[in-house]
Structure formats: structure tokens, C-alpha cells
Amino acid sequence: MKALHFGAGNIGRGFIGYLLYKSNYETTFVDIFDKVVDDINKYKRYTVITLSTSKNKEKVENVRAVNLKDSVALEKEVLEADLITTSLGLNNLKSTGELLRGFLKKRSEINDKPLDIIACENALFASDVLKKAILDGADEELKKYLEKSVGFPNCTVDRIVPNVDIEKELPIDVAVEDFYEWDIEKNKVKINNKIIGAEYVEKLDPYLERKLFLLNGAHATIAYLGYLKGYKYIHEAIKDKEINKIIVGFHSEAVQALSEKHKIDIQILKEYSNKLLKRFENEYLKDDVSRVGRDPMRKLSSNDRLITPLKLCCDLKIDFTNILFGVASGYLFNYKEDEKAQGIQNIITKEGIKKAISNVSQIKEGDYLNNMIAYKYEELKKQN
């Protein structure tokens, strides 16, 4: 089986590529950075180093790469692939879909061999986003081919892959935490139903929101509060008593909302929550708060990790005091080397916090939640 993975970064190599190798796929990475592409083609292997109390090293072999700009090589890979996956950020799915559209049109004219396309992004229903980008502008013949031969299962992906400074044999070796989870929509898969380490589930919604709220939302909150208190790493910030109390409260609020919405046993959610809190404390990861907090413009958007649980709690009349800390602290994330963070700060400086909340989180000025976020923002600002 042949796999084509867009995005040869740490997640691509250390998580998706790692599991595809364990499942006996011949994997080709696609990336825009010449150095990464050249290194993968030079070494044709890399090591995945697991960071925990004992370091474990596993080789990933039989890999190669093509440059995103090499349309001839890329077309050949799309024509031959049994599976296409991505880990390049939600914002890049539209352009990726537009690129794939032409290659899939060519493939449809040659054969109707089944294919699965899975967007492995930190977002809700990312494969649907990619599918829409491909369908927009597709002719009727291509639409029929996609309906018949191509599966677009949504998924959740969960593995912390920090930019930690470790001793490497090769520049493309990658360090990861020892936990991972990949949940895939079972009923939309065409042929790739035996990926080792992946769980195929009937209903994905609870898994998506559980992960988005309890991992991504809480993780970002630790980063933003940790930044305000001057911590460098996540494991340091979560040990701060005040931050820890907020994160435990964040989880408690989100767990209640998830249980009520999806009818999940609250005890199962609490067990998942406890596992996550231990993962956040993993000092071997040395996960920088600036990395975890990166791109608050996206993380504070209306359908992402902080605003979604906030709105759900509000709708269900569940207390959201601690989730509010996460949102407000995100608007105070003023990391100078983060272009998106500076973009938010510029809006706040020129037009005020309420306008920034309206622009970034799509919560209108005058709305109850806009006022609540703005109030908490001003409160935190005075304290820091």
C-alpha cells in the first residue's frame, strides 16, 4: 500500500508517518521546504524518540519525499496512492484541495482505484473542509468519481510533538511523547481500515470535541497563563498552583458540557481528563509555552479549542469561569515573535478588546460573551 502525506513536519514524521510505517505503508512525504525534502531523500529513514522516564527509539524506514513545487512528481504520487493524509494546518487545506483537484481529475480518467483522503489536523471535521475545497470547481465527472471511489473520513489526532532540543543522529529524527491517539470515521473509509494504532469509530463527534476541549483547549490555556506568569515550559506552568486550579476547573466545566451534549458517562471523561493532566506534567517533553500558544488568531477563532467549549457551556447554562480564563489570557498573549499574536495586539491597540473579540472570535460587540471575555481580559491585564 502506498501513502502520500502532505506536511513532513514533526507531526507528519513523528505521528502519522510513524504509524503508517508500522502498518507497512510505503510513505512519500510532500513538503515545501527543500532542506526537509532533501534530507528525507538522502537518508530514506529517521528515528522517532519517545520522551518519558525511559527514552525509546524506533526506526522509520522506506520513506522518501517530493517537493510541493514539483508538479510532475506530485502528480505521479497522487495517481499511485492508496491513501493521502495531511498535517499542514487547517489554513492550508483550501490550497491543498485546489492542488489535489487537478491530480484527482487525471486519476479519474486513468482508473477508479479506491482511495482515502484523511486530513489529520487539530480542527473539527478537517477532512470535510478538504473535500469541499476539492469539490469547489470540480466538474460533474470528477464529482461522480469522488463519490464512488474516494473516502474522506474525518479523524481526531493526538500526540504532543514538541520542538525539544535532543541529541539526534539525523536532522530529521523527531522526539514525541509516549501517548498517541488516532480516531477515524469508520463508515467513510474505502480501503484503509487496518492502520495499526488507529481506532475506527462509528460516531466521531464525541471524540473530536473531547480532544479539542480537554487537550487542545486546556493546553492552550496553560500556555497563555504560563506566558503571563513568565514560565518557559508547559510542565512548569501546570505545576503553578493557581494555573493548575484553573486547568482542573476548565476540565470540570468542559467534562460536564461534553457529558450532557454527547450522553457520555461522566466517569469515563474524568478518567480521560486525569490522563491528560499527567501528560501536561511530562517534564521530558520540555514543551515551550510559545509553541503551544502559537497562532492565537486561529486558536481563538469561533470553531476552535477555546470559543467552542465556552459557547457550549453558555448554551447549556454550565459555569464557564475557568474556560473564560483561557480565552481572555489568549488575548493577552503578546509573544513578539508570533506574527498572529502581534496581529491581535494591533487590533486591540487600534480598536479595543471588544472589537478584537468580534473580529477574531466572531462574537459581536454587545453580546453577553463578548462582554464577559472583555471584562476578564481587563481583570487579567491589571494583574499582570
Swiss-Prot record:
EC class (word): oxidoreductase
Protein's UniProt keywords contain Cell inner membrane: no
Alphabetized GO MF terms: mannitol-1-phosphate 5-dehydrogenase activity
EC nos: 1.1.1.17
Superkingdom of source: Bacteria
Reactions accelerated catalytically: D-mannitol 1-phosphate + NAD(+) = beta-D-fructose 6-phosphate + NADH + H(+)
Sequence positions that bind NAD(+): A3, L4, H5, F6, G7, A8, G9, N10, I11, G12, R13, G14
Alphabetically ordered keywords of this record: NAD, Oxidoreductase
UniProt signal peptide: none
GO biological processes: mannitol catabolic process
InterPro entries per the UniProt record, alphabetical: 6-PGluconate_DH-like_C_sf, 6PGD_dom2, Mannitol_1_phos_5_DH, Mannitol_DH, Mannitol_DH_C, Mannitol_DH_CS, Mannitol_DH_N, NAD(P)-bd_dom_sf
Family: Belongs to the mannitol dehydrogenase family.
Matches recorded under NCBIfam families: PRK02318.2-5, PRK02318.2-6
Name by which UniProt lists this protein: Mannitol-1-phosphate 5-dehydrogenase
Lineage summary: Bacteria, Bacillati, Bacillota, Clostridia, Eubacteriales
